[in-house]
Amino acid sequence: MLIQFTVENHRSIKNSAVISFAASKDKSFEEYLLHPDEKKVLLPVLAIYGANAAGKSNVLHAMMTMKEMVVGNAAKVSKGQKLPWEPFGGTKVPTSFEMVFIFQGVRYTYGFSFDAKKIYKEYLYHWPNGREALIFSRENGVYEFRENVNEQVTLSNRTPDNKLYLVSSNDWNLPQTENAYQWFLEKLTFLMDEEPATSETVAQIVSGDDKKARILKELMLADLGITDVTIKNTSCLLYTSPSPRDMRRSR
């Protein structure tokens, strides 16, 4: 269960931006709120509002990048391989991600900062008995451990500067970091198309019914200055290159 996500210095996001599922004191629709324990009250859903080019999609992109670095292709980096770093305006300072979540009844806080070449900072805390406890922290190559220290020291020595310790420790089946890793793998999911559904949108415009009206309304709300959209069919000549066999026959 996601509680909070924080991103700083990613794409159009310069300063710290926070998505929080923590509920306010408003009692409206209280029956729909989530209660993971006696103290926490969370929202079941939230929406991100903002003007065009305000960075809404980049917040989601930051979450996807964080997951990609933990359980995706970017987690499989070799020593010296570049990380997916996209800082604001070409700045040189590291990008930071942090995720707060609950998995199997335990609260976790995991975060890291990085640039294209290395991980500068990384940390994982949990609250197994309602009290904060450090699993590991890492800053400029210096690690700190409070649990299973000897094994973690060995694993940290095997972790290159450009790889997350959460990833490498799970490669070696460290039990202390397994649950946090599994949350990213199993629970953090994204339901969105990577490419725009152009053909579907065109079909809705051609239909000319309520679907087109809805599209025009969305364009109006976006304040793009577009009042109508029409589809025009045009004919064109399609040229295909002859196959090598056809070229031999024509000689």
Positions of PLM-derived features:
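Extreme N-terminal starter segment of soluble prokaryotic enzymes
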Residues: L2-I3
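Short acidic, glycine-rich loop/turn motifs
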Residues: V7, F101-F103, H126
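N-terminal pre-Walker A segment at the start of P-loop NTPase domains
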Residues: V7-L34
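Conserved RecA-like P-loop NTPase ATPase core
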Residues: N9, N52, V59, L219
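Glycine-centered tight beta-turn/hairpin loop motif at sheet-sheet or coil-to-beta transitions
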Residues: S12, F103-R107, N129
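Conserved P-loop NTP-binding catalytic core
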Residues: L34-V41, V45-A47, A51, S57-I119
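Electropositive, glycine-dotted interaction segments
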Residues: T109-L237
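Single conserved hydrophobic/aromatic residue that forms the stacking wall/gate
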Residues: Y239-R251
